[in-house]
């Protein structure tokens, strides 16, 4: 069984470097005229079959990547036509908003491509390092090198739109990975059901408040990067609907619910910046020390909040926090009684889904309905939708940690227990 093999080939060095101080709009104007054709090179030979594996669906992807990805080899061979050149470019957003991009997405994507039969020359994976100019440069480089498909997680809306426009102008199909880009007629979306992610956070929060015996919950909400990421809005709509009965990205302070909870305040962490998020919460907690329950949009923000709470002497099982991404630190906080749970988005599924979609589209085929199973809607304009492949997330607590993230190898017991301590893990049955 192949898991997160970081030494495996397929990660290529960036061919275009960021342009300091250049705006997305300026870079688009600069590169548009010079972008080369994405048509396949002449003289290539094809092999394989253009048949999509029977029964391929969002349920096909297991932690044993090879079991499903290897079935795509004939289709990948047909799609790439034997070319010894770039066919699919992948761009991840940064290394700071979440550990997932480096620790999970990149190695799983590498494995998925390799198991599907792609050579190292036929795909490359870059990371924009948090720079919109770098992300656009990487996309431009991929197109110039002949990529027919771009798998891209946009840093923000304007960057995603700029890349989608550039891709469409060159006949390149784009797959928005994890974060949607509502632009272009050749754009698809691969992710988890974002509103469901939010609902799981809300449901987990409510269960935790009850289990921890929080009296008259005075709730503070720390949302994700709503200024840059439409997913953050969907997450908020999900947990706000569950907790406050309002499917909205923002709820006014003073809102209450039938469980006796009261919203004392909310804010968002710009650009998913955990440090800024921690500062925002610290200021709110200082101004309103009666806060005794919190909702956070991911584990990075929860970690920042918990660090502040511990610094103020708060003991376990006193102030609930929430998260997503199922980080090892998040799992440790759950075991220690500082975090209620975390939404586990099995990245190995998302990586396989993206590679399967890319292979099908590269072959000129239409993804089956069991794979392209829904649509995503622009939070800013409900009339704008995008075809989507939506995976199902899981809420992880102390009770199911062993059977989910540990069993899958997403977080190892060693990683979790190094943080939480052997005695804490032993008490929870994590070994």
Predicted feature residues:
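A residue-level marker of the well-folded mature domains of exported/periplasmic proteins
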Residues: 2-14, 35-431
């Amino acid at each position: 069984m192949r898991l997160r093999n970081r030494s495996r080939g397929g990660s290529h060095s960036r061919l275009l470097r960021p342009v300091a101080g250049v705006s997305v709009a300026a870079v688009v104007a600069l590169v548009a005229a010079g972008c080369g054709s994405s048509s396949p090179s002449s003289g290539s030979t094809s092999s394989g079959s253009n048949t999509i594996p029977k029964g391929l669906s969002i349920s096909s992807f297991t932690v044993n990547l090879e079991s499903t990805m290897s079935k795509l080899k004939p289709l990948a061979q047909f799609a790439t036509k034997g070319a010894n050149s770039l066919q699919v470019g992948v761009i991840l957003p940064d290394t700071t908003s979440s550990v997932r991009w480096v620790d999970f997405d990149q190695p799983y994507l590498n494995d998925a491509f390799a198991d599907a039969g792609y050579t190292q020359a036929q795909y490359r994976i870059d990371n924009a390092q948090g720079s919109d100019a770098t992300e656009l440069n990487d996309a431009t480089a991929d197109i110039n090198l002949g990529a027919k498909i771009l798998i891209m997680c946009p840093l923000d809306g304007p960057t995603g739109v700029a890349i989608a426009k550039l891709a469409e102008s060159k006949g390149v199909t784009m797959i928005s990975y994890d974060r949607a880009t509502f632009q272009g007629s050749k754009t698809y979306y691969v992710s988890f059901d974002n509103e469901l992610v939010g609902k799981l956070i809300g449901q987990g929060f409510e269960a935790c408040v009850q289990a921890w015996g929080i009296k008259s919950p005075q709730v503070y909400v720390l949302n994700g990067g709503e200024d840059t990421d439409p997913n953050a809005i969907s997450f908020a709509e999900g947990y706000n609907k569950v907790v406050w009965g309002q499917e909205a990205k923002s709820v006014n302070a003073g809102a209450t619910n039938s469980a006796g909870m009261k919203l004392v305040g909310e804010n968002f962490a710009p650009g998913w910046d955990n440090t800024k998020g921690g500062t925002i919460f610290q200021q709110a907690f200082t101004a309103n020390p009666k806060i005794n329950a919190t909702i956070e949009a991911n584990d990075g923000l929860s970690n920042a909040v918990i660090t502040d709470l511990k610094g103020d002497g708060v003991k376990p099982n006193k102030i609930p926090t929430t998260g997503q991404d199922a980080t090892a630190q998040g799992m440790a906080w759950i075991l220690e009684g500082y975090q209620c749970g975390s939404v586990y988005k099995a990245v190995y599924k998302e990586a396989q889904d993206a590679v399967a979609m890319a292979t099908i589209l590269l072959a000129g085929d239409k993804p089956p309905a069991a794979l392209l199973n829904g649509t995503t809607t622009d939070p800013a304009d409900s009339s704008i939708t995008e075809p989507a492949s939506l995976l199902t997330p899981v809420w992880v607590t102390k009770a199911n940690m062993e059977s989910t993230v540990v069993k899958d190898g997403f977080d190892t017991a060693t990683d979790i227990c190094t943080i939480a301590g052997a005695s804490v893990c032993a008490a929870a049955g994590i070994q």
